A protein has these predicted regions:
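Cytochrome P450 C-terminal beta-domain/meander region
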Residues: 133-151
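Alpha-helical interface subdomain recognition
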Residues: 1-83, 102-107, 114-118, 143-148, ...
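A short, Trp-centered hydrophobic/proline-enriched beta-strand micro-motif
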Residues: 117-127, 168
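Structural signature of FAD isoalloxazine-binding scaffolds in flavoprotein oxidoreductases
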Residues: 66-75, 133-137, 186-187, 216-217
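A short core secondary-structure module
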Residues: 151-196
Length: 332
């Protein structure tokens, strides 16, 4: 485990910072927030075609760059810093991870290149209880020959109203807790899928409700073993937690930089407030908490690489994700 960026990782981070500083200004974010889709389609295509960020941690055999989660987190940190309005979290940190963790080779071959090209994908698992684990799954399925019939409602689906591809989590009728949970991947133009935008407090992040009514899916859509996907779903959610924590770490750095800059320009009692000891203490506390949180994120990213490659530290993923989540949420 390395405790400093490689030259390549530093270049990726610096390039992301420069690109997003130029393309995701405050004015651009406000414009994207009130647009129909909630993001700038031109910017999204530029991220796909020019920056190739959707492909960062996708293996080369599926058209990706074959890099790791540390590189992904380095980019996500800058996205959080500049409040990028784009379906990146849903497509890359959720749907792509779902395919990498639980997808068959055929599913990866079909859908990962589409995500790299700019198709929007997402994960739907939650209902009204808002829990962040496999027990939150309430949509049910039943077998009908070789097919599966899904019924129920999903809430808080990230970019669900814009998604071209969905990963659905559902539980077998009559099952409880983490038993009987399966994952399915399919396009969103099938009969039986209804979507509606969900008003959110955070307008930089679009969410939706999705209702599935007698949605018929065949065996080719099943990810992993039928009824045994709870462990996969929990792993996917841990990976998404680390990604969100990375965005928070970037946001923290921007808040600190803005605060320090303001303290240098605001004058009181004949001098700038940056010279006041109380302000210095506050800035130092902010920096310390931010560095601790960032360290937790990058440690978790290293563990995520282990988990995605079945390394010796893979079983520490949930703990590392929780530590990053706790530190970043408290500090931010």
């Amino acid at each position: 485990m390395d405790f400093a960026f490689t030259e390549e990782q530093q270049m990726i981070r610096d390039t992301a910072a420069a690109f997003l500083k130029a393309s995701s200004s405050s004015a651009a974010v406000r414009t994207a927030m009130v647009s129909d889709k909630g993001f700038d389609s031109g910017l999204w295509q530029s991220i796909c075609a020019d920056m190739y960020w959707q492909a960062l941690h996708i293996p080369e055999q599926y058209g990706g760059m074959g890099l790791g989660y540390v590189e992904l987190v380095a980019v996500l940190e800058q996205m959080g810093r500049y409040l990028l309005c784009a379906p990146y979290m849903s497509s890359v940190a959720m749907a792509t991870n779902a395919l990498l963790v639980a997808g068959t080779d055929a599913q990866k071959t079909l859908y990962l290149p589409q995500i790299i090209e700019g198709k929007i994908a997402s994960l739907a698992f939650n209902s009204a209880n808002r829990n962040w684990d496999a027990c939150a799954v309430s949509v049910t399925y039943r077998r009908d020959g070789n097919d599966f019939i899904l019924n129920g409602n999903y809430r808080y689906v990230l970019d669900g109203d814009n998604a071209d591809v969905m990963v659905f989590a559902a539980r077998e009728e009559g099952s409880v807790d983490e038993n009987g949970i399966s994952l399915f991947v399919c396009p969103t133009d099938l009969n039986g899928i209804e979507r509606a935008a969900l008003p959110t407090m955070d307008q930089t992040r679009r969410q939706a409700t999705i209702t599935v009514t007698n949605l018929r899916l065949d065996e080719s859509t099943v990810m992993g073993d039928v009824g045994k996907a709870a462990k996969h779903l929990n792993k996917i959610l841990d990976l998404a937690t680390i990604a969100l924590a990375a965005e928070q770490a970037g946001g923290m750095q921007e808040v600190l930089d803005m605060s320090v800059e303001y303290s240098k320009s605001r004058s009181q009692f004949g001098r700038t407030i940056a010279g006041f000891q109380a302000i210095k203490h506050k800035a130092a506390d902010m920096m310390l908490r931010g560095e601790v949180a960032r360290s937790a994120v990058y440690y978790a990213a290293c563990i995520a690489d282990e988990a995605l490659n079945d390394g010796p530290l893979a079983n520490e993923l949930s703990e590392a994700a929780s530590i990053a989540k706790s530190h970043c949420s408290e500090a931010y």
